[in-house]
A protein has these predicted regions:
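Alpha/beta-hydrolase active-site loop
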Residues: 125-183
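Residues at helix-coil transition
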Residues: 30, 113, 173-177
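Short substrate-entry loop that stabilizes the transition state in hydrolases
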Residues: 71-88, 92-131
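Short, surface-exposed linear patches
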Residues: 25-27, 47-52, 114-117, 122, ...
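Generic detector of contiguous secondary-structure segments
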Residues: 13-16, 101, 105-108, 117, ...
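Divalent metal-coordination and catalytic microenvironments
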Residues: 28, 111, 168
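Domain-level recognition of soluble alpha/beta enzyme cores
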Residues: 1-91
Length: 183
């Protein structure tokens, strides 16, 4: 399952527009009822847009990664929840710099198959490419072109790390809020 939320309380660190608010796209893997008839999800959504960025970020020629667009996962979009007597534990996944929300799909699927819900967020502008439901994009803007070290590195990265932490706190709060509304 995919989600997209806006944290209206936070300005977007990575853009010049003071009216931009922090926008997040994410993906959830959860214990689901078995379904053989539903189409499995591809590993890459929007492969025609993602492959160029993956090639660029990894330093590989595009032809070496085009096979990724044919990879199918075990996930079924909006599959029915597996009936359980108790709430499932939740794991948050936060990709590394220039990563993506679904980079560890195989781990997320394995955890979900063992009764654990996994929530992953594309940290917009820290992910190599975030594609929102309306088709707009947040490209990677976290490069350190000056190769800073020590205090300069920390001064450069700290706002980004704080943004990532705030992203995860927002997602947890939003899940709790939505869960309370459904109880």
């Amino acid at each position: 399952q995919y989600f997209e939320w806006v944290d209206a309380s936070r300005e977007e660190l990575f853009t010049e527009d003071p009216n931009d608010r922090r926008r997040l796209a994410g993906q959830v893997w959860y214990p689901a009822a078995a379904s053989r008839s539903e189409a499995r999800q591809p590993y890459l959504d929007f492969p025609e847009r993602r492959l160029d960025m993956i090639a660029y970020q990894s330093g590989l020629p595009r032809f070496m990664i085009t096979h990724m667009q044919r990879v199918q996962t075990n996930a079924v979009l909006n599959a029915p929840l597996l009936a359980q007597d108790q709430k499932t534990p939740v794991v948050l996944f936060s990709h590394g710099l220039s990563g993506m929300k679904n980079q560890n799909t195989i781990q997320a699927e394995m955890l979900a198959s063992h009764g654990i819900t996994v929530i992953s967020v594309d940290h917009a502008y820290d992910a190599y490419l975030t594609i929102f439901a309306d088709g707009s994009e947040a490209d990677y803007r976290s490069s350190d072109t000056e190769n800073r070290t020590g205090e300069a590195f920390l001064a450069f990265r700290s706002p980004q790390l704080n943004t990532r932490v705030a992203d995860l706190v927002f997602v947890l709060n939003e899940i709790e809020r939505r869960s309370d509304e459904n109880d």
